[in-house]
């Protein structure tokens, strides 16, 4: 069974928000709404100190996790929210009645009501691209080269990102999006730094929905459960 997901190497993420901007542009997300959000985790200030004694920080991107057992699908009264064969969770706008039961059941607060269309929207994992063999736009445009896309059933080492974007010399300025298709990619296993699979691979809090997205964070305290 296929389960598409995104892996984010949080040690590489620089918080540039290119993922947020590119997502809004390609999907026509309304002003004030986001399919992809960027959170700054830390530094934390203790109440008995004027300055922080914990200067460690990182950026955490949050979007629809395309869960293995999505609660949004369970509560949808019309079947508008449904799980696809590729593991993604999608919304059939023709069936959506805007009741927002799905948004209320989502533990990550990543669904919103499009007030003009009166339907709920969220990250589609760029179905229009991935169904044609492409990469999600947030992966293709990641400024820190921190995001990778793949099938969990094949292991996170096989997750892919654009290969050309990693060239240090930048001699070629004619790079086109269609070059990001199969044959011109690099895997997380090839590029990623060593990590502990037991202690440095994380998910957002599991509320019985089994989130699919993976976060790798080395040598720092994971605070994504807070």
For the regions a language model picked out, list residue spans one by one.
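Non-ligating segments of multi-cofactor redox enzymes
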Residues: 1-226
